Regions:
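PLP-dependent class I/II
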Residues: 1-118
Length: 118
């Protein structure tokens, strides 16, 4: 394992730079897309996920209930914060592992759910 780590760190870094750029684009797309539909989330600095509070108008729901709502009504899966311990309650996590077109589609679907609560 140590030899593999050395090879990865000392070898060509082209893939690493491409991966970092890909995740940065996805992060920026989701952060700005959610802001555009009224859900302002903090911009993470170095992760492939976004951790954020549930929108205020859904505060009556647990993180699991909100995640279930998004899954059932929008077909979008997020991780409920409660799965990360008691301090995660009230939050959800978006994984930035899908390609940009699917992330755009997910934001459009989430927008419909947020509008339902108005």
């Amino acid at each position: 394992v140590q030899w593999a780590a050395i090879a990865a760190l000392a070898g060509p870094q082209d893939y690493v730079h491409r991966a970092v750029a890909t995740y940065a684009r996805r992060r920026d797309l989701v952060v700005s897309g959610l802001a555009g539909i009224g859900w302002h989330v903090p911009k993470p600095k170095g992760t492939f996920y976004i951790w954020t509070k549930i929108p205020r108008k859904f505060n009556a729901l647990t993180s699991l209930e909100f995640a279930t709502l998004l899954m059932q009504e929008a077909g979008v899966v997020v991780s409920p914060g409660s799965g990360f311990g008691e301090y995660g309650e009230g939050c959800v996590r978006f994984a930035l592992v899908e390609p940009e077109p699917r992330l755009r589609e997910a934001i459009q679907r989430i927008a419909r759910v947020l509008q339902m609560a108005d």
